[in-house]
Amino acid sequence: MDKAKDMIKGTPNIPLFSVIAGSQNKGRGTRGRTWLSSSSINGNLYMTVVFKMSAVPVPLTLMPLRVATLIAPCIQRRITSSSSLYLKWPNDVLIDNEKVCGILIEIDDDNVVVGIGCNVCEAPTVDSNGAEAGRVSTCLSKHNKDILNNVDYDSIVTNTDNKVETLLETHPPLLGLAVDIVEAIDIWLQNKDTPSSVLKDFEEKMTTATQRIRTDRLVDQSLLGKEILPLRLNNDGSLVVRVIDDNRDTTLVADYLW
């Protein structure tokens, strides 16, 4: 994402574009958590898509939800197992309740910078406790064995310069997914959209599994450690949940870790 931000400095009329990295060592997730690529094999997708804020056809509070619904079908088409794909509010993609893709959206002047990380060939180990704690991860190759058969790992591993061109040439699944995502976002920006459509599309894929809130970065600290059940979205994109322990409903307006 930082590389993409550097590219748009001093370029006021730059159109939609994307940057793909072969690996990342300064990656970040929500709430400042780190998001690093594996040191063994460069087989996952790390990309950034940049476009003008003025081109977004829905309120900005709904943009994370819409971006998630655009990326989800690109991943869904690559699942050949009987596994189920869900969206976790506000913009994570899950397969069988395990995280396969994360999305981070930042605003830079009048540009929207969308960072996307998708586990294609391998699922990184995620801490279960501490500041870097997160959901168990999965990868596309676990749900589509053909993905591994279409990768020339020898060329990737011997590419000491880590040139993205070589990575994409030897990794058709990676390139195909990146192209699909960019095309989906581009088509969306060129067409009309409505808040009701965003909410409907997200709720159709939203996970309704009972989960436990584990982050301490909450406005309502009484929710820490509580078991919750996602219920519905408000018009502004915030999430209404039921607190199981207290049998009450409340609204979440910021990302939480569960």
Predicted feature residues:
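N-terminal lobe of the biotin/lipoate ligase/transferase fold
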Residues: M1-S84, C101, L148-T158, E165, ...
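Residue-level signal for inorganic ion chemistry
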Residues: M47, I71, D92, G117, ...
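Structural motif
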Residues: I95-D96, L223
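Short, acidic (Asp/Glu-rich) active-site segment that either coordinates a divalent metal cofactor
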Residues: D110-D154
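Conserved, helical-rich catalytic subdomain that frames metal- and/or nucleotide-binding sites
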Residues: K145-E227, L231
